Amino acid sequence: MRRIIYMSTIATLMCASSAAAATQRVWITEFAGVGAAGGGAIQIARLPAVAKQQVDTTGGVQTSSAFNASTRFIRVICEVQCAVRGDGTAAAATDLLIPAYTAEYFGVVAGGTLSVIAAP
């Protein structure tokens, strides 16, 4: 009986980990402005975020939803190395690379989009 329970637990864990490994998420957080200190702007994002998006590049190139009207810059984190493009054209593996789990910030146009593709 213990062996059956053990094997069932192992099978469940294997299915869960392969499902997680199959996902290649990209988190996009939108910001309206930068922080301020001592009367001047400083290079940090001002919270709260305007909007948050998530795209999955498992199936190939994906494009975000249009950015909020007040969005001025975005923070991007990819689960796997990705290539991004922000000019309305579909991303290719040869575009701007972002290493996995590295936060990158980009200035954007309100209403624009970000195209992302996994580029391992």
Segments from the language model and where they lie:
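Bacterial N-terminal signal peptides
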Residues: 8-16
